[in-house]
Design a protein with these regions (language model features):
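Conserved catalytic core of the tyrosine transesterase superfamily
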Residues: 1-181
Length: 181
């Protein structure tokens, strides 16, 4: 005998699929890493609902995204999965983005989104970043053989990364707007 699927569960599942497969990659223009984090965060929330709250995919509803459940999820992430406050905030942010999309697609989910927005972020202590000394930077920049083409390329790339503080992935994804290639 087939289980009766809650119509709201089907609607949420459809919106979730559309959000992950269409909205996030194209409209929101997120990186594959961000998309992967969003997917992991939602999977963890669904796992929490299944394991702790006894909610199955067939019984999913708007009530599953209430403020109380989300706050319990954050505690579950910390206690059962060993997540740091920073990781909990990333997971919470991903869930909020989905719920915002959900409320955009169907106004009846607006209260769910607003409840999620009111869940406080976890407090995390800022780690002091210890930079490299001038001598260490000089040693690093002197490593590539600037006499060769590849060495000069590497030196230029290292210098650009250092002077702009851009991440290598960000630099590699830059596109030339005027390029006709």
């Amino acid at each position: 005998m087939k289980k009766k699927i809650n119509p709201q569960a089907m609607q949420i599942a459809d919106y979730l699929h559309d959000w992950l497969e269409h909205y996030v990659p194209s409209i929101k223009a997120c990186s594959p890493h961000t998309k992967r984090n969003y997917k992991i965060s939602v999977k963890l929330y669904v796992e929490f609902l299944r394991v702790i709250k006894g909610t199955t995919p067939e019984t999913l509803s708007a009530e599953c995204f209430c403020m109380e459940y989300i706050m319990e999820w954050i505690i579950w992430l910390k206690e059962n999965r060993g997540c740091s406050p920073a990781t909990c905030n990333v997971r919470l942010s991903a869930l909020r983005v989905f719920l915002k999309y959900l409320s955009f697609r169907d106004i009846s989910y607006m209260s769910v989104f607003l409840q999620a927005e009111n869940v406080p972020n976890e407090k995390n202590s800022k780690r002091k970043v210890i930079g490299l000394s001038k001598q260490a930077v000089d040693v690093l920049l002197s490593m590539p053989n600037q006499g060769s083409t590849i060495g000069f390329r590497d030196y230029t790339l290292m210098l650009l990364l250092y002077s702009t503080a851009v991440r290598i992935n960000e630099l590699l994804t830059l596109k030339d707007r005027k390029s006709t290639r």
